[in-house]
């Protein structure tokens, strides 16, 4: 009976490792989405400039760096399960906020529909563009805050669920998700963007 329990526990560890791998892969797919859709989809649609891209990317990187100092502490304080859930919740909220940027811009500027937004000219177009950049930047900042919790939580999960002899291998597996996500993103994100355009 004890062998069955030990085998189930060992198998469960590797299921957890696979989930960590998947989460890390999605984490990196998320990060690549902006750069892979900027030139052909985002910039032309919203009339944003390369300066806007630089500001958005810099804000993400700065928030990610700052949030890393706090995410590990938050995960330690909340515990592994709740801490990872917190990180994924914030990260998911940030991802969802991107979808609300157009609506928020319409509400802020007072235009009633997307046709007016796209057809706006002169100073109104500059205002619409500026406001929508700031909403998008805010969504990226929330995304960065949540994504910063992925690695501290994954390392803590590995330390808690795996014996010392398996920790390096388990860490290598979930960490490979970063590279896989970065490699898969150029293959699937532009295709998805074209399909859902």
Predicted regions and their residues:
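Extracytoplasmic
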Residues: 15-50
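Residue-level signature of mid-helix packing/kink "hotspots" within the transmembrane helices
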Residues: 32, 61-69, 182-183
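Helix-loop-helix hairpin linking two adjacent transmembrane segments in secondary transporters
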Residues: 178-197
């Amino acid at each position: 009976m004890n062998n069955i329990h030990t085998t189930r526990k060992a198998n469960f560890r590797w299921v957890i490792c696979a989930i960590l791998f998947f989460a890390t892969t999605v984490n990196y797919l998320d990060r690549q989405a902006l750069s892979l859709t900027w030139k052909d989809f985002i910039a032309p649609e919203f009339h944003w400039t390369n300066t806007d891209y630089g500001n958005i990317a810099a804000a993400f990187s700065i928030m990610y760096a700052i949030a890393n100092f706090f995410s590990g502490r938050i995960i330690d304080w909340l515990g592994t399960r709740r801490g990872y859930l917190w990180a994924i919740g914030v990260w998911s909220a940030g991802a969802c906020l991107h979808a609300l940027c157009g609506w928020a811009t319409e509400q802020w500027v007072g235009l009633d529909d997307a046709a007016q937004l796209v057809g706006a000219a002169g100073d109104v177009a500059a205002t619409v563009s500026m406001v929508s950049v700031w909403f998008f930047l805010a969504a990226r900042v929330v995304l960065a805050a949540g994504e910063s919790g992925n690695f501290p939580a994954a390392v803590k999960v590995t330390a808690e669920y795996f014996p010392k002899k398996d920790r390096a291998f388990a860490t290598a597996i979930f960490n490979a998700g970063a590279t896989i996500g970065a490699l898969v993103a150029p293959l699937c994100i532009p295709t998805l963007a074209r399909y859902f355009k």
